[in-house]
Amino acid sequence: MLKRRIIPCLDVKEGRVVKGIEFVQLRDIGDPVEIAKYYDESGADELVFLDITASTERRQTMLDVVSAVARKVFIPLTVGGGIRSLEDISSLLKAGADKVSLNTLAVESPSLIREAADRFGSQCIVVAIDVKFKDGEYYVYTYGGKQKTDLLAVEWAKQVAALGAGELLVTSMNQDGKQSGYDLSILEQLREVVDIPIIASGGAGNAEHVVEALEKVDAALLASILHDRKTTVEEVKHVCKSHNLPMRFVSTKMD
């Protein structure tokens, strides 16, 4: 059985890690390189690095920061934000990213998902879906959660999986930063329609919330509770293991 993954998320703005609530009210957390190194040494399975204002500011992701982070960590690194072309993807992979996360570009140019998967391999193409529950439906949002689309999350997920995406990163905007639990409903709906791995994001407040998500999907993205040192990656994994979820530990004796 594949191990479930715990993935710290570094939302980066102007070269600093930040965290907000419902994609706003951002506060400074610290230096991305040092934070990434800490999580790597703490037993994280992967890292996600999101340049959260690159798309809205219509500029490229900070390649120098990505490169600096990649030099310090030895676990898979996914990078997203401001990607507008296959050349941007190539630049990020050359800078040290193992995977790239596409959101706005994927919505505006779906064919690029297939092109990217064909050129670089599905395993390194993650499609990020920012969803908000509104008027009884889960809608897809772009440009860092600022622009609502007419796309329904379930239909969009099926489409991107068919186009060759290797993984979905699903963030509930309603739950983001609130630490009240993941939106399990959308995770269940997506699990029923796609076979590719799903990463749950938005809402983790404790290890039990992570357990709830990992009983439905493959990986959990965490930010606030780790950044604020309310818990650690290792502690979360122990709780997950106690619920019979397969986890990877830094110390093989715990595996």
From Swiss-Prot:
MF term (GO), any: imidazoleglycerol-phosphate synthase activity
Q: Catalysed reaction per UniProt?
A: 5-[(5-phospho-1-deoxy-D-ribulos-1-ylimino)methylamino]-1-(5-phospho-beta-D-ribosyl)imidazole-4-carboxamide + L-glutamine = D-erythro-1-(imidazol-4-yl)glycerol 3-phosphate + 5-amino-1-(5-phospho-beta-D-ribosyl)imidazole-4-carboxamide + L-glutamate + H(+)
User: A Pfam family for this UniProt protein?
Assistant: His_biosynth
Q: Which InterPro entries match?
A: Aldolase_TIM (IPR013785), His_biosynth (IPR006062), HisF (IPR004651), IGPS_HisA/HisF (IPR050064), RibuloseP-bd_barrel (IPR011060)
Enzyme group, top EC level? lyase
Gene Ontology cellular component annotations, sorted alphabetically: cytoplasm
Where does this protein reside within or beyond the cell? Answer: Cytoplasm
Documented EC number(s): 4.3.2.10
- In terms of superkingdom, the source organism counts as Bacteria
**Assigned keywords, A-Z:** Amino-acid biosynthesis, Cytoplasm, Histidine biosynthesis, Lyase
Q: Which biological process terms from the Gene Ontology are attached to this UniProt entry?
A: L-histidine biosynthetic process
- Subunit info? Heterodimer of HisH and HisF.
The record ties this protein, via HAMAP family, to:
HisF
Its family remark reads: Belongs to the HisA/HisF family.
Q: What is this protein called?
A: Imidazole glycerol phosphate synthase subunit HisF
Q: What is the lineage of its organism?
A: Bacteria, Bacillati, Bacillota, Bacilli, Bacillales
